[in-house]
Amino acid sequence: MLPSLQSLTKKVLAGQCVPTNQHYLLKCYDLWWHDGPITFDHNLKLIKSAGIKEGLDLNTALVKAVRENNYNLIKLFAEWGANINYGLVSVNTEHTWDLCRELGAKETLNEEEILQIFIDLKFHKTSSNIILCHEVFSNNPILQKVNNIKMRIEIFWELRELIEKTDLLNNEFSLSTLLLKYWYAIAIRYNLKEAIQYFYQKYTHLNTWRLTCALCFNNVFDLHEAYEKDKIHMDIEEMMRIACIKDHNLSTMYYCYVLGGNINQAMLTSIQYYNIENMFFCMDLGADAFEEGTIALGEGYKLIKNILSLKIYSPATTPLPKSTDPEIIDHALKNYVSKNMMIFLTYDLR
């Protein structure tokens, strides 16, 4: 839709750095949202306010305004270029529905359009965005129009390590439960602290899921927060197994090792999942499950069997700090290079 002169003026004003003593002007122009001034980043097309400091893209901001039945902002965001059809996924009153139609929205969205809006809205990995996505799509009847398998494919792709190597997200869960676990997992994967706390406070029955995601996605900071502060515990060997299912998970593996996890079992798990960097890291920490690892592989896996057959490995001579402090672990492992991996890579196999 063509913007009015007034909306263009507001757009320019929202892009300015307005002094605090002139915020009353922004209130007069309805550039006020969640107890703070609305600002608009023209380059990134991000809407920000006191309640959404990380920002929402224009279409997502429209979805939020529609959900809140904020008619002034719905009109404003539509005039600024937001796709009014996006509002149809969060519309919840007849009056707002009528307004969206007046602004050019379609009568209904088809399956492909709904799925594309879902994909677009979940793209930005910020706390504000993930919380909004959860609120919009939780038990949303519009998702009934989308093929269940297509929705699951979109969810499973980002959580494929958990899907492939655990049974935690099998088909017995409803789509609503699956989506809830998905948003929680994304918050942990990208260490979105505000979103993590939102889900933790609201869904205490998913505490084990939080710990599992922190282990799998190598988020040693939230792992420590959950384990030490919030006292979310599980068997240490199961924790180590989950940490080993994804390669390069050195931080959460080491955390479990310091807690007393069996490093030989961790080496075996890493071998079974063909996670070579994890395997070498276990060797650095003193693991020596070479024969057991070769047997566990069975047929095939020539490369890893060749690695295990060599008698050239030994524990790292420079010990890592025995601490569960996530800052210390992160600092120690940020640029970590496995001693035993380097030995193998420089070994003359001829």
From Swiss-Prot:
Transmembrane segments: none annotated. Disulfide bonds: none annotated. The keyword Magnesium does not apply. Keywords: ANK repeat. ANK repeats lie at residues 57-89. InterPro entries: ASFV_MGF360. The keyword ATP-binding does not apply. It holds the Pfam family ASFV_360. One of its GO terms (biological process) is taxis. It comes from the Viruses. Belongs to the asfivirus MGF 360 family. Plays a role in virus cell tropism, and may be required for efficient virus replication in macrophages. This is Protein MGF 360-12L. It comes from African swine fever virus (isolate Tick/South Africa/Pretoriuskop Pr4/1996) (ASFV).
